[in-house]
Amino acid sequence: MAAYVVFMRDETLNPVELEKYSADVDVSFEGHDVTFLADYGTIETLEGHAIEGAVILQFPDMAAARAWYRSPEYQEAAEHRFRGARYRGFIVEGL
């Protein structure tokens, strides 16, 4: 069953760190079966507070999503994201 990783950027803290994250994150997808469904496109807030951006990634299942997120390559890149902005992120299982 497909699983989706969703990241919502609430607030940018350090644009330089986000640039480093963007430069480093692509290598983390190598060897993982991932499909980008949304990548910082236009957002219309329907409920709650507005966000700056969102990413939605599709993986074959929860285990594959976790394997990518926990990979050393992603965790190394994510350090820049953690310093660069406030995000919320989660994995949700599809139907």
What does each model-found stretch correspond to?
Residues M1-G53, P60-R66, R70, E93-L95:
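Short S/T/G/P-rich N-terminal loop/turn motif that feeds into the first structured element of a domain
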Residues M62-F90:
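C-terminal structural segments of small proteins and small subunits
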